[in-house]
Regions:
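Helical membrane-embedded segments and adjacent short helical loop/helix-boundary regions
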Residues: 2-16, 20-82, 87-98, 102
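Short alpha-helical transmembrane interface motifs in multi-pass membrane proteins
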Residues: 7-8, 59-60, 93-95, 121-122, ...
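Hydrophobic/small/kink-forming positions within alpha-helical transmembrane segments
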Residues: 13, 17-18, 104, 156, ...
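Small-residue-rich segments of transmembrane alpha-helices in multi-pass membrane proteins
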Residues: 39-51, 71-74, 97-110, 128-138, ...
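Helix-loop-helix hairpins and the membrane-proximal interhelical loops
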Residues: 80-92, 115-116, 139-154, 172, ...
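Transmembrane alpha-helices that form the ion-translocation and gating core
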Residues: 97-133, 158-173
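Alpha-helical membrane segments and immediately flanking helix-loop junctions
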Residues: 123-150, 156-157, 172, 176-214
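Juxtamembrane boundary at the C-terminal end of a transmembrane helix
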Residues: 221-230
Protein backbone atom coordinates (compact mmCIF):
# COMPACT_ATOMS: atom_id res chain seq x y z
CA UNK A 1 0.00 0.00 0.00
CA UNK A 2 2.81 2.40 0.88
CA UNK A 3 4.39 1.87 -2.57
CA UNK A 4 1.13 2.90 -4.25
CA UNK A 5 0.88 6.11 -2.24
CA UNK A 6 4.57 6.91 -2.57
CA UNK A 7 4.26 6.85 -6.36
CA UNK A 8 1.67 9.63 -6.29
CA UNK A 9 2.91 13.21 -6.54
CA UNK A 10 -0.34 14.44 -5.02
CA UNK A 11 -0.26 12.31 -1.87
CA UNK A 12 0.42 15.21 0.50
CA UNK A 13 -2.17 17.52 -1.03
CA UNK A 14 -4.85 14.83 -1.13
CA UNK A 15 -4.34 13.64 2.44
CA UNK A 16 -4.16 17.20 3.80
CA UNK A 17 -7.29 18.43 2.03
CA UNK A 18 -9.39 15.34 2.77
CA UNK A 19 -8.42 15.27 6.45
CA UNK A 20 -9.14 19.00 6.81
CA UNK A 21 -12.48 18.61 5.03
CA UNK A 22 -13.38 15.81 7.43
CA UNK A 23 -12.40 18.02 10.37
CA UNK A 24 -14.59 20.84 9.03
CA UNK A 25 -17.49 18.39 8.68
CA UNK A 26 -17.11 17.29 12.30
CA UNK A 27 -17.01 20.88 13.55
CA UNK A 28 -20.16 21.84 11.64
CA UNK A 29 -21.97 18.73 12.81
CA UNK A 30 -21.09 18.90 16.52
CA UNK A 31 -20.55 22.69 16.73
CA UNK A 32 -17.81 22.48 19.35
CA UNK A 33 -14.28 23.87 19.42
CA UNK A 34 -12.83 20.47 20.33
CA UNK A 35 -13.35 19.37 16.74
CA UNK A 36 -10.96 21.96 15.37
CA UNK A 37 -10.36 21.21 11.65
CA UNK A 38 -6.62 21.85 11.88
CA UNK A 39 -6.23 19.64 14.95
CA UNK A 40 -8.32 16.87 13.37
CA UNK A 41 -6.35 17.03 10.12
CA UNK A 42 -3.02 16.82 11.97
CA UNK A 43 -4.12 13.74 13.91
CA UNK A 44 -5.55 12.01 10.83
CA UNK A 45 -2.46 12.76 8.74
CA UNK A 46 -0.08 11.42 11.40
CA UNK A 47 -2.13 8.24 11.86
CA UNK A 48 -2.35 7.74 8.10
CA UNK A 49 1.39 8.15 7.54
CA UNK A 50 2.23 5.79 10.40
CA UNK A 51 -0.30 3.16 9.30
CA UNK A 52 0.88 3.24 5.67
CA UNK A 53 4.55 3.50 6.70
CA UNK A 54 5.09 6.64 4.63
CA UNK A 55 7.95 8.96 5.59
CA UNK A 56 7.52 12.69 6.02
CA UNK A 57 9.63 13.65 2.98
CA UNK A 58 7.37 11.62 0.68
CA UNK A 59 4.30 13.27 2.16
CA UNK A 60 5.83 16.74 1.95
CA UNK A 61 6.67 16.35 -1.75
CA UNK A 62 3.01 17.04 -2.41
CA UNK A 63 1.98 18.93 0.73
CA UNK A 64 4.60 21.64 0.19
CA UNK A 65 2.46 23.10 -2.60
CA UNK A 66 -0.19 23.99 -0.04
CA UNK A 67 2.45 25.92 1.91
CA UNK A 68 2.89 28.23 -1.05
CA UNK A 69 -0.65 29.46 -0.46
CA UNK A 70 0.21 30.62 3.07
CA UNK A 71 1.63 33.99 1.99
CA UNK A 72 -1.30 35.09 -0.22
CA UNK A 73 -3.75 33.76 2.38
CA UNK A 74 -2.05 35.86 5.07
CA UNK A 75 -2.11 38.89 2.78
CA UNK A 76 -5.88 38.47 2.42
CA UNK A 77 -6.21 39.20 6.13
CA UNK A 78 -5.65 42.85 5.20
CA UNK A 79 -9.10 42.98 3.57
CA UNK A 80 -11.20 43.07 6.78
CA UNK A 81 -8.64 45.45 8.28
CA UNK A 82 -9.10 47.86 5.37
CA UNK A 83 -12.86 47.64 5.78
CA UNK A 84 -12.50 48.71 9.42
CA UNK A 85 -9.80 51.35 8.86
CA UNK A 86 -11.89 54.21 10.30
CA UNK A 87 -12.52 52.24 13.49
CA UNK A 88 -8.79 51.59 13.75
CA UNK A 89 -7.97 55.29 13.39
CA UNK A 90 -10.36 56.19 16.20
CA UNK A 91 -8.94 53.57 18.56
CA UNK A 92 -5.28 53.36 17.48
CA UNK A 93 -3.88 54.13 20.95
CA UNK A 94 -6.00 51.47 22.64
CA UNK A 95 -5.16 48.95 19.93
CA UNK A 96 -1.40 49.49 20.14
CA UNK A 97 -1.42 49.43 23.95
CA UNK A 98 -3.44 46.21 23.93
CA UNK A 99 -1.08 44.49 21.51
CA UNK A 100 1.99 45.65 23.45
CA UNK A 101 0.46 44.37 26.69
CA UNK A 102 -0.23 41.00 25.10
CA UNK A 103 3.31 40.64 23.77
CA UNK A 104 4.91 41.59 27.10
CA UNK A 105 2.59 39.21 28.97
CA UNK A 106 3.55 36.34 26.66
CA UNK A 107 7.30 36.95 26.91
CA UNK A 108 7.21 37.50 30.67
CA UNK A 109 5.17 34.34 31.25
CA UNK A 110 7.64 32.25 29.26
CA UNK A 111 10.56 33.75 31.19
CA UNK A 112 8.96 33.02 34.56
CA UNK A 113 8.07 29.45 33.59
CA UNK A 114 11.58 28.89 32.23
CA UNK A 115 13.00 29.92 35.61
CA UNK A 116 10.52 27.77 37.56
CA UNK A 117 11.13 24.65 35.46
CA UNK A 118 14.86 25.36 35.09
CA UNK A 119 14.88 25.20 31.30
CA UNK A 120 18.14 25.51 29.43
CA UNK A 121 18.74 28.74 27.51
CA UNK A 122 18.18 26.94 24.21
CA UNK A 123 14.85 25.56 25.41
CA UNK A 124 13.89 28.98 26.75
CA UNK A 125 14.49 30.87 23.49
CA UNK A 126 12.70 28.10 21.59
CA UNK A 127 9.47 29.06 23.37
CA UNK A 128 9.77 32.85 23.14
CA UNK A 129 8.10 33.17 19.69
CA UNK A 130 5.20 30.83 20.54
CA UNK A 131 2.45 33.40 19.98
CA UNK A 132 3.46 34.80 16.58
CA UNK A 133 2.91 33.48 13.08
CA UNK A 134 5.07 30.54 11.98
CA UNK A 135 7.06 32.36 9.29
CA UNK A 136 8.31 34.98 11.76
CA UNK A 137 8.62 32.57 14.69
CA UNK A 138 10.93 30.22 12.79
CA UNK A 139 13.30 33.08 11.99
CA UNK A 140 13.33 34.32 15.59
CA UNK A 141 14.00 30.85 16.98
CA UNK A 142 16.82 30.21 14.52
CA UNK A 143 18.41 33.59 15.17
CA UNK A 144 18.33 33.06 18.96
CA UNK A 145 19.68 29.51 18.70
CA UNK A 146 16.53 27.61 19.59
CA UNK A 147 15.07 24.35 18.30
CA UNK A 148 13.21 25.55 15.21
CA UNK A 149 11.15 22.37 14.73
CA UNK A 150 9.93 22.54 18.33
CA UNK A 151 9.14 26.23 17.90
CA UNK A 152 6.91 25.39 14.93
CA UNK A 153 5.10 22.70 16.93
CA UNK A 154 4.58 25.06 19.88
CA UNK A 155 3.26 27.81 17.58
CA UNK A 156 0.74 25.42 16.03
CA UNK A 157 -0.37 24.14 19.45
CA UNK A 158 -0.75 27.72 20.72
CA UNK A 159 -2.86 28.64 17.71
CA UNK A 160 -5.10 25.59 17.96
CA UNK A 161 -5.67 26.13 21.69
CA UNK A 162 -6.47 29.78 21.03
CA UNK A 163 -8.93 28.80 18.33
CA UNK A 164 -10.66 26.31 20.63
CA UNK A 165 -10.63 28.31 23.88
CA UNK A 166 -10.83 31.96 22.76
CA UNK A 167 -14.59 32.37 22.79
CA UNK A 168 -15.00 30.59 26.13
CA UNK A 169 -12.24 32.60 27.82
CA UNK A 170 -13.75 35.87 26.58
CA UNK A 171 -17.08 34.86 28.10
CA UNK A 172 -15.51 33.82 31.42
CA UNK A 173 -13.66 37.12 31.81
CA UNK A 174 -16.58 39.08 30.33
CA UNK A 175 -14.56 40.50 27.44
CA UNK A 176 -17.43 41.74 25.29
CA UNK A 177 -15.97 44.58 23.22
CA UNK A 178 -15.17 43.37 19.66
CA UNK A 179 -11.90 45.32 19.50
CA UNK A 180 -10.69 43.81 22.77
CA UNK A 181 -11.64 40.32 21.61
CA UNK A 182 -9.82 40.72 18.30
CA UNK A 183 -6.64 42.08 19.87
CA UNK A 184 -6.56 39.38 22.53
CA UNK A 185 -7.05 36.55 20.05
CA UNK A 186 -4.66 37.82 17.37
CA UNK A 187 -1.89 38.70 19.81
CA UNK A 188 -2.03 35.37 21.63
CA UNK A 189 -2.80 32.87 18.88
CA UNK A 190 -1.80 34.42 15.50
CA UNK A 191 -3.47 33.30 12.23
CA UNK A 192 -5.08 30.13 13.56
CA UNK A 193 -6.78 32.10 16.31
CA UNK A 194 -7.71 34.81 13.82
CA UNK A 195 -9.84 32.26 11.97
CA UNK A 196 -11.92 32.04 15.14
CA UNK A 197 -11.98 35.83 15.50
CA UNK A 198 -13.46 36.11 12.01
CA UNK A 199 -16.20 33.71 13.04
CA UNK A 200 -17.04 36.01 15.96
CA UNK A 201 -17.40 39.10 13.80
CA UNK A 202 -15.91 41.42 11.18
CA UNK A 203 -14.42 43.84 13.72
CA UNK A 204 -12.89 40.99 15.73
CA UNK A 205 -11.35 39.57 12.57
CA UNK A 206 -9.92 42.91 11.46
CA UNK A 207 -8.35 43.69 14.84
CA UNK A 208 -6.98 40.16 15.11
CA UNK A 209 -5.42 40.46 11.63
CA UNK A 210 -3.71 43.70 12.63
CA UNK A 211 -2.47 42.11 15.85
CA UNK A 212 -0.69 39.35 13.91
CA UNK A 213 1.55 41.83 12.11
CA UNK A 214 2.19 44.25 14.97
CA UNK A 215 2.72 41.56 17.62
CA UNK A 216 5.11 39.80 15.24
CA UNK A 217 7.30 42.89 14.97
CA UNK A 218 7.17 43.62 18.70
CA UNK A 219 7.96 40.00 19.57
CA UNK A 220 11.02 40.01 17.32
CA UNK A 221 12.36 43.02 19.22
CA UNK A 222 11.19 41.80 22.62
CA UNK A 223 12.53 38.27 22.18
CA UNK A 224 16.03 39.61 21.58
CA UNK A 225 15.87 41.55 24.85
CA UNK A 226 14.28 38.74 26.88
CA UNK A 227 16.75 36.20 25.50
CA UNK A 228 19.56 38.01 27.31
CA UNK A 229 17.76 38.36 30.65
CA UNK A 230 18.28 34.73 31.71
Amino acid sequence: MSEFFESSAFLGVTVSLLSYAFGSFLKKKFKTGIFNPLLISIVITIVFLLYCNIDYDTYNDGAKYLSWLLTPATACLAIPLYQQIELLKKNHKVVLFGILSGVLTSLTTIMVLAIIFKLSHKEYVTLLPKSITTAIGMGVSEELGGYVTITVAVIVITGVLGNILADGICKIFKINHPIAKGIAIGTSSHAIGTAKAMELGEVEGAMSSLSIAVSGILTVLGAIIFAHII
